[in-house]
Regions:
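A compositional/biophysical signature of low hydrophobicity enriched in polar/charged and small residues
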Residues: 1-177
Length: 177
């Protein structure tokens, strides 16, 4: 993966807190042009650092009131790809992970209520060839949801401050003219 610099990290730090922030504001905060921000964001997307942008829908607002994690044990780990293909046909499943530990995989799904959850478990998940056991954990409350830390180092912060100081000096010099 291509290296990202301190400006890239600053941009990421800003846009991960507010994906709708205008590039003009990001540019002002970073001390560079709007075009530079646009080019940087596009490059970060092209190299796979930024993997998407969009709106997040509150599942409860659509009637999905039960957030559930299900640990799944497969007959054989080699059945993982087959099971994932089956899971892709179940719209309530929003995440799937191949794991170490007591389960072969863990999925996250949303159900309307406990009856809907039971229907999904008994009539959909446990009917898939290769699934031999499930263990269900219902989330009572999501306490934290955030992105991974961008990790601006002291060196990165100093570089950004230097950029800002240089920009401010240019603005001041031009104002005096």
């Amino acid at each position: 993966m291509e290296k990202i610099d301190s400006l890239d990290k600053k941009i990421l730090e800003i846009i991960t807190h507010n994906a709708r922030i205008p590039f003009k504001e990001v540019a002002a905060e970073c001390g560079v042009s709007r075009a530079a921000i646009h080019q940087r964001v596009q490059r970060l997307a092209d190299i796979g650092v930024i993997t998407g942008s969009g709106y997040h829908v509150n599942p409860a607002s659509l009637g999905y009131n039960t957030c559930t994690y299900v640990g799944i044990t497969l007959e054989r780990g080699s059945m993982y790809k087959h099971v994932v293909k089956e899971f892709e046909n179940i719209p309530e499943i929003v995440e799937c992970h191949f794991t170490t530990g007591p389960y072969t995989m863990i999925i996250k799904l949303y159900a309307r209520d406990n009856a809907h959850l039971m229907e999904l478990l008994n009539n959909r998940l446990q009917e898939i060839e290769g699934v031999i056991a499930t263990e269900t954990l219902i989330s009572l409350n999501q306490s934290i949801k955030k992105e991974v830390p961008i990790g601006l180092s002291d060196e990165d912060k100093a570089a950004i401050e230097a950029l800002m100081a240089r920009k401010n000096a240019l603005v001041t010099d031009n104002a005096d003219d």
